[in-house]
Design a protein with these regions (language model features):
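C-terminal hydrophobic helical "lid"/dimerization subdomain
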Residues: 2-6, 279-331
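Glycine-rich beta-strand-centered segment in the early N-terminal region that forms part
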Residues: 28-45, 57-99
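NAD(P)H dinucleotide-binding glycine-rich loop of Rossmann-like/cofactor-binding domains
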Residues: 52, 67, 85, 91-156
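Mid-domain Rossmann-like dinucleotide-binding core that forms the NAD(H)/NADP(H) cofactor-binding site
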Residues: 87, 125-201
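Short glycine-centered segments of the SAM/dcSAM-binding site in methyltransferase folds
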Residues: 91, 149, 173, 239-240, ...
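Short, glycine/polar-rich helix-capping loops at beta-to-alpha or helix-loop-helix junctions
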Residues: 100-103, 178-186, 203, 251-256
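Glycine-rich phosphate-binding loop and adjacent beta-alpha segment
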Residues: 178, 226-298, 331
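Short amphipathic alpha-helix with an adjacent loop that forms part of the alpha/beta core around
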Residues: 203-213
Length: 331
């Protein structure tokens, strides 16, 4: 196995802190192990876990790259033993365990997907993290079904814009919460039945009114904190609450009696630390059931902005501003 170069530029985290701690460094090009591909990165998605890692709150799993970046798109340039599907020269998009903010990145072949026809590298890099996360949490853990009500907090986030569209595509009725009127408009354009501006409306009361008092069946929550108890109040009987982040805190107090009386399911997950075989299963489901909707235009890839790799700090600054959709680094 050979690589194009011995060294590459990558964005390192030079200590805990603000975006300014993201700095270009020259490091060795990684080598693919068994079942892995070496990808020449053309674009890398920027996600909230990258920000959490920069702040020292979400360290890289043991044995994986400390370079941030959980999704990439690019061209295969080398492969390890046992790879079967993708070969040198193939273009792929991939969910990775880290290392995406770099010129080259190693990816498990089973977590790689073909890029949908007609999609460029920037769009492709905006797909894996959101689609894997939404499919696993909304449809597998949350069990969202046709005709059910789905509530998405953070409707214009990178996760939110995917969740709204996929839920609607599979026949659910969608409610989204956001923090401004223009974001409400964006959610409605993506297919939400109702958009709630949480700065001026109580989402619990709005959900109750929209569902005629029944509540929603599935909630995907990235907020945590005091939203958890309010989510429980917003769920219908046999409802499912799925937490994937906790921007307002992970320690909460809930009324278990309400959970018991309504027979609720409270669950959640993190994707980065899951075994490769779990991610492989999610990848196949995404490829079989979700990506065709991208190919036929039913689900759009929403990219807010793209920055050069050298401006990763500016991309993180953009994460803290009012944006709609994904932020991507061009490599």
């Amino acid at each position: 196995m050979t690589t194009l170069r011995a060294t590459m530029t990558a964005i390192a985290i030079a200590g805990k802190g603000g975006p300014e701690v993201l700095r270009p460094e020259t490091i060795a090009v990684p080598q693919p192990g068994p079942g892995q591909l070496l990808v020449k990165v053309a674009a890398a998605g920027v996600n909230r876990p990258d920000v959490m890692q920069r702040l020292g709150l979400y360290p890289a799993p043991k044995g994986h790259s400390e370079i941030p970046g959980l999704e990439i798109a690019g061209t295969v340039v080398a492969s390890g033993e046992g790879t079967r599907r993708f070969m040198t020269g193939h273009t792929v998009m991939a969910l990775v365990n880290g290392g995406g903010y770099a010129e080259y990145c190693v990816a498990d072949e089973t977590a790689c997907l073909p890029i949908p026809t007609g999609r460029g590298m920037v769009e492709a890099a905006a797909i894996p993290e959101g689609f894997f996360t939404v499919w696993h949490n909304v449809f597998e853990r949350g069990g969202l079904k046709q005709g059910e009500w789905f509530l998405m907090h953070g409707g214009t986030s990178g996760i939110g814009v995917v969740a709204i569209q996929l839920a609607r595509a599979f026949g659910a009725k969608v409610i989204a919460t956001v923090g401004s009127a223009d974001k409400c408009t964006a959610c409605l354009e993506l297919g939400a039945t109702r958009a709630i501006d949480y700065t001026s409306e109580d989402f619990v009361e709005a959900v109750k009114a929209e569902t005629k008092g029944r509540g929603v069946n599935v909630i995907l929550d990235i907020v945590g904190g005091d939203y958890v108890e309010r989510n429980i109040r917003s769920l219908a009987e046999d409802g499912r609450l799925v937490n994937i982040a906790f921007q307002k805190g992970s320690k909460v107090t809930i009324d278990l009696m309400r959970v018991m009386l309504k027979r609720l399911t409270l669950t959640g997950s993190t994707l980065r630390i899951r075994p490769a075989e779990v991610k492989a299963g999610i990848a196949r489901a995404v490829e079989d059931k979700a990506l065709p909707l991208v190919g036929n235009g039913q689900v759009k890839i929403i990219v807010d902005s793209a920055f050069p790799l050298s401006e990763a700090a500016k991309a993180h600054e953009r994460m803290d501003e009012s944006h709609i959709g994904k932020i991507v680094l061009r490599v």
